Amino acid sequence: MERKNASDFPQELLNLFDLYVHGDIDRRAFLDGAKKFATGGLTAAAIFESLRPNYAWAEQIPKDDGRVKTERATVDSPSGNGKISGYLARPAQGSKWPGVLVVHENRGLNPYIEDVARRLAVENFIAFAPDGLTSVGGYPGDDEKGGELFRKVDREKMTQDFVAAAQWLKARSDCTGKIGVVGFCFGGGIANTLAVRMGSDLSAAVPFYGGQPAAADVAKIKAPLLIHYAGLDQRVNAGWPAYEAALKANHVSYEAFVYEGVNHGFHNDTTPRYDETAAKLAWKRTIEFFNKNLG
């Protein structure tokens, strides 16, 4: 499949796809809305396929990269769904590292998120990417089916699963005991939520274009935050002014960056919404932030 960029699509069409991805409209409604852009022999179905992720593009760090060791792990989650499984990536050299929990989007633990875990491992972190779909069989290998399963999982229990995964990572003998979290889309919201739920047990949180916690809960945040937003992401950005006001009122340490002219999901290098310049800058800032706060 030819790789396309956001600039290859009208912004109205990208906004329509964003509504579909987040469950505000179904596939049929997207296809109906996309018909107006289907010209020159291009069909709405072809447009849909061109916007979907292509995981052949996700492997910045190959699975067999000699710098990284990976395995599957399952964590007990008595307050959640009982257990949560995930993907553990750690440096091949050394014996103890700071930990980073990697939280997926609203489709489950797909190859992009596994690659993010490996990217952290080559930066000398032990990274664990849990699969919030564990209780319904795990990520099914397809994002559309993953989205359907995602809607079936109790959200509070899933959140407790991520808390359990974070505490498990923190307690591992090969972790220094200092952990952070990075999350994308839904996972960005979970990164904010873990900052609230875990208090001083969390040492750093990096939400990428994630939903914000209630203002009343912000006082519970003890970890410093590095917050990334996409300039064209009106849906998520609408909650930022109130969140920032609460962070300031409660003297929470934070840095926030808005990457102008890019879309929600700009870090995900498997879709046309990926923006290489913004993604690389945000990731550089993320690694520097984790080195500062977890080292």
Regions found by a protein language model. Name each.
Residues 107, 133-156, 265-270:
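Cap/lid segment of the alpha/beta-hydrolase catalytic domain
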Residues 163-222:
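Primarily recognizes the serine-hydrolase "nucleophile elbow" in alpha/beta-hydrolase
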Residues 143-182, 293-294:
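Gly/Ser-rich "nucleophile elbow"/oxyanion-hole loop immediately N-terminal to the catalytic nucleophile
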Residues 57-94:
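N-terminal cap/lid segment of alpha/beta-hydrolase-fold proteins
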Residues 96-105:
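Short beta-strand element of the alpha/beta-hydrolase
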Residues 227-229:
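Short beta-strand/loop motif that positions the catalytic acidic residue
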Residues 1-29:
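N-terminal secretory signal peptides
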Residues 18, 27-53:
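N-terminal export signals
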